[in-house]
Curated annotation (Swiss-Prot):
Reactions catalysed according to its record: orotidine 5'-phosphate + H(+) = UMP + CO2
GO molecular function, one term: orotidine-5'-phosphate decarboxylase activity
Alphabetized CDD domains for the sequence: OMP_decarboxylase_like
UniProtKB keywords: Decarboxylase, Lyase, Pyrimidine biosynthesis
InterPro entries for the chain: Aldolase_TIM (IPR013785), OMPdecase (IPR014732), OMPdecase_AS (IPR018089), OMPdecase_bac (IPR047596), OMPdeCOase_dom (IPR001754), RibuloseP-bd_barrel (IPR011060)
Entry protein name: Orotidine 5'-phosphate decarboxylase
Functional summary from the UniProt entry: Catalyzes the decarboxylation of orotidine 5'-monophosphate (OMP) to uridine 5'-monophosphate (UMP).
Pfam families: OMPdecase
Pathway(s) where this gene product acts: Pyrimidine metabolism; UMP biosynthesis via de novo pathway; UMP from orotate: step 2/2
Quaternary organization: Homodimer.
Amino acid sequence: MSACQTPLIVALDFPTREAALKLADQLDPALCRVKVGKELFTSSASGIVETLCDKGFEVFLDLKFHDIPNTTAMAVKAAAEMGVWMVNVHCSGGLRMMAACREELAKRSGPQPLLIGVTVLTSMEREDLAGIGLDVDPQEQVLRLAALAQKAGMDGLVCSALEAPALKAAHPSLQLVTPGIRPAGSAQDDQRRILTPRQALDAGSDYLVIGRPISQAADPAQALAAVVAEIRG
């Protein structure tokens, strides 16, 4: 497997396996990792992760597991057995759920994927949180969940780049994965709390998830190269 030389993760947000692999074939595993989300994973039935790994990609399995502790831990174990590089769970599942996942991965003799907690989705603002009974700012809720993740032994968090400085200050050992990244001049789409790649890295993010600016570009390879150049400045 080629070691990726950048913090970029390209989201393979497609409805079919064929479309996802068509994009993957245009990308260099040395310049990006790839993310497999719910739609692609579900529609592909099985094998998409293994196929991407065989192509040299490190795979972030973005299924945001959230269930009772044992069920979630077994799902994380299954993801590890597929060879994923990173897997995530919802921090709102609680301390016992996250700790169970950590303990299950610790039993493995082989490589362990990074175990990442999802805090507050980047599409959510204060009024969205209020709608589910949380009368708090997104950043305050992120910090609450981050403290739980740290206590549970998680490797990192998914968070907005706007929350990254506070998270790095409070939990410097956690690796921060930031979606909602848009290169300068890109449309915001449905992501609300966004920054450019360079701004996100400067804010403390360790990994950057980019979707449509690359996946929907006329030339995805060129779009990826442009983002790499923007990062390297």
